[in-house]
């Protein structure tokens, strides 16, 4: 049975079972790997691939070899490289029109029972880790029992993977087949898998596959306390549990060249360093339509840069082969004018992000805490800024003024949500601020807090190009008596401030607005406007801060709980729409500009890059373009 949600530019198809096409009898491989086979360093390609590899339909059949040159911002910039190579049990793939479909990745098939309580998956026969070890359900069971349910590593399980309060259960059928079950229906589970069963080792996400043969030596169910203590010391962390997680030096692919992976490339020279390199995985499990083992490209090189001007210079000098990350929309004209000089062309993708101000409802400053929790204050912040000016000056007019809500083309798009509180109205902003008791002003015409101090708010961003945007915003807020203090800080510090509840407002692109059901946590407050409230919710009150009984965020959580146990897609979507509506109506996050046409730099010899796709964290950013089928045309160099 096929269930389809179709609206505009996005199509979500959930297939109960998908037959993997039979690959050609004879497979081809990169000359780089062929040389290793001839030297006796690798087995033949037929022995490295699964019996029936997954087939990736390349835009056109490519050629092997070459280095993909990119740029990165430092050790904290792991997500740029990560999204080039993530793999999921199921993944979103664009069709010829750019609509997305859910298809199997490293599995042979899957099935769902009638009430969506059981999901059965069969791994590809002959699937292998990058070191050649077989991938089996023993790795799945290791992840589930020794990581997911291990309180030392995963003290709390995210609500999106414990609907109704009960974590998912695992049953291993044989060495390739396993079943995940829930106590109640979970119609969104496949959507969530396509977002979160990734090559990035999030401990409480259904990654399903952790290499037991390698990681068990760092796990307390297998290793002695003495050995774990030695490992922690060796890797420079305080506790053995710190070895784990997406930032752990053992389980982070970005940091550990020894970690076996199933992705198209693996880390070769990790950060920090001026150049980070990734090299092809000789055991990657996919081929193109003619039986050529993927990826086409041998290596990916990320060169360090510190300032936006330096990155733009790299582009103009032809040093960037293909990149979307850090390519600034406000510089679109500059990029176009230098196409011939740099030997590239500029494509565009549509961003599902909304650049936004995220007030911290849990901010430690008592005066600001009270204001940020006041709907009228958030309303004033929203209507007190001219988004059209922000769009023109900050994004070259390539976006649109909008709230944080599902993008056009999403199954959950609502035009009324899109324009909620987005019309510039400084008179209304002043009226609202006076109404809530901020009518007193100092000699510079800034409003005074009840304690007599000037109303000052620090807004922090980590992008260089955000500086002029924040200055424009500061001018608008000055007109309504608020002193906005912009700060540009390092990305690592920005993340730490968010994680440690040490910020007032953060300027950031709010994502996951295409298929919201795949990851609603931004709307629920996680890593966003109410991190401490979400921690309280996630841990059943053991951590974080309890929200007031009247707080609308409680309704948002209740709506998700209804959606996550609904018996039908219609019932689930009704609850999800209620959740989104409550979030938008409260104005918890102040959206500014979204649906931006993102410039994509593509060298003229860099092939198979699709144009016009949707960029979102849900679909794993640039990964939606199927990077393993990108190739470099040596004849055009």
Residue ranges and their predicted role:
Residues 1-24:
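Gram-negative bacterial Sec-dependent N-terminal signal peptides
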Residues 29, 35-38, 43-114:
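N-terminal lobe/hinge region of extracytoplasmic solute-binding protein
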Residues 124, 250-256, 278, 283-334, ...:
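Ligand-site clamp/hinge motif
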Residues 143, 147-157, 170-172, 268-283, ...:
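Extracellular/periplasmic solute-recognition and catalytic clefts
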Residues 63-74, 108, 118-121, 140-143, ...:
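Short, well-ordered beta-strand elements
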Residues 108-154, 179-181, 189, 314, ...:
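Aromatic- and charge-enriched surface segment that lines or borders ligand/interaction sites
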Residues 159-244:
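Surface-exposed binding/hinge segments that line
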Residues 72, 259, 265, 271-276, ...:
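Detector for C-terminal structural segments
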């Amino acid at each position: 049975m096929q269930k389809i949600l179709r609206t505009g530019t996005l199509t979500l198809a959930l297939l109960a079972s998908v037959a993997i096409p039979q690959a050609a009898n004879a497979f081809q491989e990169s000359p780089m790997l062929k040389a290793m086979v001839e030297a006796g360093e690798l087995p033949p390609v037929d022995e490295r691939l699964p019996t029936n590899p997954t087939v990736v339909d390349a835009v056109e059949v490519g050629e092997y070899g070459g280095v993909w040159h990119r740029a990165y911002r430092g050790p904290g910039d792991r997500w740029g490289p990560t999204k080039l190579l993530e793999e999921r049990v199921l993944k979103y793939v664009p069709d010829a029109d750019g609509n997305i479909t859910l298809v199997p990745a490293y599995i042979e098939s899957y099935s769902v029972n009638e009430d969506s309580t059981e999901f059965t998956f069969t791994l590809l026969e002959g699937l292998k880790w990058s070191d050649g070890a077989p991938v089996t359900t023993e790795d799945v069971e290791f992840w589930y029992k020794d990581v997911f349910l291990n309180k030392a590593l995963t003290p709390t399980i995210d609500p999106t993977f414990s609907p109704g309060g009960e974590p998912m259960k695992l049953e291993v059928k044989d060495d390739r087949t396993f079943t995940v079950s829930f106590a109640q229906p979970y119609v969104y589970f496949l959507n969530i898998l396509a977002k979160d069963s990734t090559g990035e080792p999030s401990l409480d996400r259904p990654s399903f596959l952790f290499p037991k043969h390698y990681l068990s030596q760092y796990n307390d169910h297998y290793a002695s306390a003495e050995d774990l203590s030695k490992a922690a010391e060796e890797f420079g962390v305080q506790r053995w549990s710190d070895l784990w997680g997406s930032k752990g030096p053992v389980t982070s692919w970005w940091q550990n060249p020894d970690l076996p992976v199933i992705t198209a490339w693996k880390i070769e020279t990790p950060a920090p360093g001026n150049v980070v390199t990734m090299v092809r995985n000789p055991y990657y499990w996919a081929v193109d339509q003619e039986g050529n083992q993927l990826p086409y490209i041998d290596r990916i090189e990320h060169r360090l840069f510190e300032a936006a001007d330096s990155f733009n210079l790299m582009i103009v000098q032809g040093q960037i082969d293909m990149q979307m990350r850090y390519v600034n929309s406000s510089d679109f004209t500059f990029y176009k004018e230098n196409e011939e000089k740099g030997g590239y062309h500029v494509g565009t993708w549509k961003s599902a992000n909304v650049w936004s101000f995220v007030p911290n409802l849990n901010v430690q400053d008592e005066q600001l805490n009270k204001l940020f929790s006041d709907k009228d204050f958030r309303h004033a912040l929203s209507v007190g800024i001219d988004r059209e000016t922000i769009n023109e000056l900050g994004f070259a007019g390539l976006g649109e003024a909008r709230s944080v809500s599902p993008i056009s083309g999403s199954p959950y798009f609502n035009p009324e949500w899109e324009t909620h509180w987005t019309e510039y109205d400084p008179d209304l902003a002043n009226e609202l601020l006076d109404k809530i008791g901020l009518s007193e002003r100092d000699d510079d015409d800034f409003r005074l807090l009840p304690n007599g101090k000037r109303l000052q708010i620090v807004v922090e961003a980590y992008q260089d190009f955000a500086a002029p945007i924040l200055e424009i915003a500061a001018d608008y807020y000055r007109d309504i008596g608020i002193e906005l203090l912009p700060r540009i800080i390092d990305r690592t510090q920005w993340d730490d401030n968010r994680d440690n509840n040490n910020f007032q407002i953060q300027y950031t692109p709010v994502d996951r607005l295409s298929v919201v059901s795949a990851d609603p946590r931004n709307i629920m407050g996680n890593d966003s406007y109410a991190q401490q409230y979400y921690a309280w919710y996630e841990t059943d009150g053991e951590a974080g801060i309890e929200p007031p009984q009247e707080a609308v965020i409680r309704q948002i959580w209740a709506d998700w709980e209804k959606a996550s146990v609904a018996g039908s897609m219609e019932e689930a979507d009704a609850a999800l729409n209620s959740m989104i509506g409550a979030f938008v109506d409260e104005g918890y996050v102040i959206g500014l500009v979204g649906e931006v046409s993102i410039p994509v730099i593509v060298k003229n010899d860099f092939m198979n890059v699709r144009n016009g796709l949707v960029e979102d964290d849900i679909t794993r950013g640039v990964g939606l373009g199927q990077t393993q089928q990108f190739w470099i045309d040596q004849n055009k160099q």
